[in-house]
Amino acid sequence: MLSSQTSSIFTVSRLNQTVRLLLEQEMGQVWISGEISNFTQPASGHWYFTLKDDTAQVRCAMFRNSNRRVTFRPQHGQQVLVRANITLYEPRGDYQIIAESMQPAGEGLLQQKYEQLKAKLQAEGLFDQQHKQPLPSPAHCVGVITSKTGAALHDILHVLKRRDPSLPVIIYPTAVQGDDAPGQIVRAIELANARGECDVLIVGRGGGSLEDLWSFNDERVARAIFASRIPVVSAVGHETDVTIADFVADLRAPTPSAAAEIVSRNQQELLRQIQSAQQRLGMAMDYYLANRSRRFTQIFHRLQQQHPQLRLARQQTALERLRQRMGFALEARIKQANQRQQRVSQRLSQQNPQPRIHRAQSRIQQLEYRLTENIRSRLSEQRERFGNAVTHLEAVSPLATLARGYTVSTTTDGKVLKKIKQVKAGDIMTTRLEDGWLESEVKSVTPGT
C-alpha cells in the first residue's frame, strides 16, 4: 500500500513551492479591501501590515519601490483598497499578499470603476481618433452645458466676452454633481443636438475631488458625448483632472477658460489683422497708381517721339549712316577676301596631297597582303586540326568497331551485355550491327571456359 503512494509523497519544501506556484498562477493579481492593522516600516523602507475584516485577516507586504507611489501615510484602522499578488513565503509556509498599489477605500473603489469603464469604452473604440469631429472655424454659436451657478460658467462667459463679444452663447443649465447630474447632462446634450442652435458644445465644470467629478466618469454621459453630432469640447476641472468624458470628447481643454479660448476668435487679434490688411491694401493701391502714372508718362513721351516728321528725319539720318557703313564694310570685306585668298593659295602650294595619297596607298597594299597571308595560315592550321580530330573520332567511334564485324547487345532495359549472367533462357535482347538492329530470344546460356 505504501509503495503505491510514494509518487504522491511531498517534501515540505516541495509542498510549499507547489502551493506558492498554484497561488501565483491561478489567482494572479486581485483587488482586496480591508482594514489596516499592525503596520510597521523597518529601516529597509518596506511596509508590513495585516489586512482584516470582521471575520478574517491576511499578512501583507508592500516593498519600497511600490509604496513610494502611495500618496498617503497608512494608519492603523484605516480602510484601504489594495491591488496585490497572492503568494506564499516558502521558508515558513506563511500565506501572504504582496501589494502593488494602495488607495483609501472610497476613492480606491471609484478609481477601480474608472479604470474598468475606461478599458471597456476603449475596447469599443469610443476613444479612437478616427471618430473625432473637427471643430468649426470659426464657430458661429457656442453651447455651454454646465451648472448655471458654478464658477466654470462665469469663467467661460468672461473669456468669450473678452475675446469675441459678438459670438452667440446658448446655456443648457444642468447639475454637475450628485446622483441626478449624469441624467441631466445626457438630456442637455440630446436637447442641444435636437435644437441644432449651436455648432460646438462645451461640456464641463470646475475642479473638485474624484467624487465631485464623478458625473463626467458616467458611462451614460460618455456615450451621449460620443453620439453627439455637434463637436464637443470637454472642460472638466483642472489640467490634472482627467475624466472619461475627456477621452470621448472631440477635444479636451485643460480648464473651462481654456475651452472658451479654443472655440472663440480673438476680436483684438482680428482687429489687428484687419488693420494690417487695410494698411497692405493702401500700400498696394499707392504702388499701383504710381506705377500706372509712370506708365502713362512713358507712353506720352513715346508718342511725342514718334511724330511722323521726327521719325522721317531720324530715318533719313539713319539711312545716310547706313550708306556710309555699307561702303566701309564693302571695302573691308573685299580687302579681307583678297588676303584670305592669298593665304589659302600659299597653304595649298605647301600642302600638296599627292605624296600623302601615295604613302597611304602603299600602306594599304602592305596591310592587305599581310591580312591575306594571315588568313591563309590560320585556315590551313584549322583544316589540319579538324582533320586530326576527325581521324581520332573515327578511331574511337563505336561505329568503326561495328564496321569491323563486332556487335553490341543490350537487355530490354537498355543495359549493355558484358557477361552471360545478365540474361537467362527466354530473355529478349537487342543487338546493334553496323547497318541496323536485331531482336532475338535467348534459347540457352553456356558459360565460357
UniProtKB/Swiss-Prot annotation:
One GO molecular-function entry: nucleic acid binding
One Pfam family of this protein, by short name? Answer: Exonuc_VII_L
Known catalytic reactions: Exonucleolytic cleavage in either 5'- to 3'- or 3'- to 5'-direction to yield nucleoside 5'-phosphates
Q: Name one GO biological process term.
A: DNA catabolic process
State if Metal-binding is listed as a keyword. Answer: no
Keyword list, A-Z: Cytoplasm, Exonuclease, Hydrolase, Nuclease
Under the cellular component aspect of Gene Ontology, which terms does the record hold? Answer: cytoplasm; exodeoxyribonuclease VII complex
Under what name is this protein listed?
Answer: Exodeoxyribonuclease 7 large subunit
Q: Where in the cell is it found?
A: Cytoplasm
Q: What does this protein do?
A: Bidirectionally degrades single-stranded DNA into large acid-insoluble oligonucleotides, which are then degraded further into small acid-soluble oligonucleotides.
* Annotated family: Belongs to the XseA family.
SUBUNIT field: Heterooligomer composed of large and small subunits.
The main enzyme category here is hydrolase
The answer to whether the entry has keyword Transferase is no
Its EC number(s): 3.1.11.6
**NCBIfam families recorded:** xseA
